A protein has these predicted regions:
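Ferredoxin-type iron-sulfur electron-transfer modules and their immediate structural context
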Residues: 1-52
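Flanking helices and flexible, charged tails adjoining ferredoxin-like Fe-S electron-transfer domains
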Residues: 1-3, 8-12, 16, 20-22, ...
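Iron-sulfur cluster-binding cysteine motifs and their immediate structural context
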Residues: 35, 43-92
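Structural motif
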Residues: 36-38, 66, 174-177
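Ferredoxin-type iron-sulfur electron-transfer modules in oxidoreductases and energy-metabolism complexes
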Residues: 45, 57-60, 191-194, 198, ...
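Cofactor-cradling patches in redox/metallo enzymes
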Residues: 142-144, 152, 158-226, 231-242
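Long C-terminal interaction/binding lobes of large macromolecular proteins
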Residues: 207, 245, 255
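Short amphipathic C-terminal alpha-helix that caps PH/PH-like domains
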Residues: 241-249
Length: 255
């Protein structure tokens, strides 16, 4: 039992977090990556990524965290080129903000200029969300459930998940959005009273992930809605989600 407790502490940190905005995670956690200037076979690294998250932009390597599965294989194969930090604050309302370039120490955050005015004025004290799994694998769904447990307790900030979209202020989508879930997702979205939030959680929801080229997906619904927040991860960490929501809806938590 004691050994099990030590393993939990090593991988997840302390089991009760007093301040979710100042918490730190163990070094083993894979958060925002850094790309060094080390000379390698660039094409070999690009081809190595299973989700095409690594690419060249103006002769500089870049990683798109909206596509990254955070598998860590690139770091293991090219340890002198790529290193994942334990920085978990990487939710943003700017899709391009999820791209990390070679040689930079990236800070990913919610951009105040892109936040709709009504969000801050209406949802700055209480926020109810309806989660829709659109072909998800239960990984992100489990982590979202953990956001409300005694360890993270996002309810202390007035943030909760609700059973009905009619009782919600926004929709949280997980999964790559399979064709069979499009109608259900649209019904849930339209049932939420305006103004409503629309949040994509996890690599599958943001880009399709490893299923991006699958004919079973139908993601054109995303072009019809305003996306308020992207939360990268595979699966996401509760601290990433909670801090992203706080930055989006509460001015005092923005960096």
């Amino acid at each position: 039992m004691f050994l099990d407790d030590l393993i939990i502490v090593k991988h997840q940190g302390k089991q009760f977090i007093k301040d979710l905005t100042k918490a730190s995670l163990p070094e083993i956690f894979r958060g925002i990556p850094q790309i060094a200037d080390e000379t390698i076979n660039t094409q070999e690294l690009i081809d190595f990524c299973p989700t095409a998250a690594i690419f060249l932009d103006k002769n500089k390597l870049a990683i798109d965290l909206g596509k990254c599965a955070f598998c860590g294989d690139c770091q293991m194969q090219f340890p002198n080129k790529i290193k994942f930090t334990n920085q978990y604050k990487m939710a943003t309302n700017n899709r391009d903000g999820l791209i990390v370039y070679q040689g930079e120490t990236k800070e990913i955050k919610v951009e105040a200029s892109l936040i709709r005015k009504e969000i801050q004025s209406i949802f700055n004290r209480s926020l109810k969300l309806r989660q829709v799994s659109a072909g998800g694998d239960n990984g992100n769904e489990l982590e979202l459930g953990a956001c409300g447990n005694v360890n993270f307790d996002m309810g202390r900030y007035g943030i909760e998940f609700t059973a009905s979209p009619r009782h919600a202020d926004g929709i949280v989508v997980t999964g790559p959005i399979s064709e069979n879930m499009v109608e259900a997702l649209q019904i849930a979205f339209e049932a939420v009273p305006e103004p409503r939030l629309f949040i994509l959680v996890g690599v599958d929801a943001i880009s399709g992930g490893i299923f991006a080229e699958s004919t079973a997906l139908k993601r054109d619904f995303l072009s019809k809605v305003h996306i308020d927040l992207y939360v990268p991860g595979n699966p996401i960490h509760p601290l990433t989600f909670i801090n992203g929501i706080l930055e989006l809806t509460r001015k005092k938590y923005r960096r």
